[in-house]
Amino acid sequence: MSRVVWIVIDSVGIGALPDSEKFGDKGVNTLGNIVKAHSDIKIPNMRKLGIGNIDGVDFMQPIENPIGVYGKCAEVSQGKDTTTGHWEMTGVLVETPFKTFENGFPKDIIDEFERRTGRKVVGNKPSSGTTILDEYGEHQMKTGDVIVYTSADSVFQIAAHEDIIPLEELYSMCEIAREIMMGDNAVARVIARPYVGPKAGEFVRTSNRRDYSLNPFEPTVLDNIKESGLDVIAVGKIEDIFNGQGITEAIHTKDNMHGVDETINYIKKENNGLIFTNLVDFDSKYGHRRNIEGYKEALEEFDTRIPQIIEALNEDDILIINADHGNDPTYKGTDHTREYIPLLVYGKNIKQGVNLGIRKSFADIGATVADILNVKLPKHGESFKNNIEK
């Protein structure tokens, strides 16, 4: 039977959605603006799959005979973050935005967190991760206080130096925060942000990040696959995004290339169902930090691995590559951007060069995955399996 290898290239948006101005994101285009800033970008394998042939892509020449199926998806859910994007992909729409705390967290929340963890809080405001470490990192090392901060996303983030607060204690504090941030105060994610380094300006966040999500509101495609007795193998932060729900096996990764390595390892193993990978570096290392050149280089690095991924596929396997939101490194601020996501599909036994056009929802991807694996379809989404079958 077919397996699906589903790779999320985190934040690689492909142009502003019609409602992007409502989200403060006029004229954004993550991939397009990177290409405009670096016209020498080399992503030949994504181009072979058809990324330059997608409707509305005017920043890259289309090619004559793409080997993949290609299109783009609009987002129905009211958000532009990781949780919202991944949940919609798997058939759960977020129609009421997750709560955000643009002025920091209320005193009663911080008081309860301090009481239950036994640690004082500093920060408690919206900030980028690098800025907050420059501001409070040395204080945190001297005092043992913890840095709590948020962003335009629905997140409660806790930063601590790995030499001062052990990872297990940091993770335990995140579990406490997750319990507190429920009900009327529910945030989409509590995030552990460990860092290392000697002083401000030299602090580096480590790959020991962990996300503590809410459970999806409804069953996802992952639940349907698991309940059918198939594998749902989560690579990278997929397990965290779904709070483990619908997952049969998981491995966390330290960077994009480790994520690709583990994906290829699983493709080569005996398993049935879904291998679901998130490659987060595009977003966390380059999008939020508005590092255009780093983002370009990360795209090129991933592109060089696509032939290895394709070579590892079995005859009936289907590869899907898409993003979950945008994070335009040329845009103001440090937050995600509301964009269409590219959709690339490849398989040795599916059609080539099919234009899927503009899909109405990210959920069409999950519906197609369910359809390919012959499991129950999700509540939302329209499968395009019939468009790609030979």
Locate each region found by the language model.
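Feature captures the catalytic ectodomains and active-site-proximal regions of enzymes
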Residues: 1-390
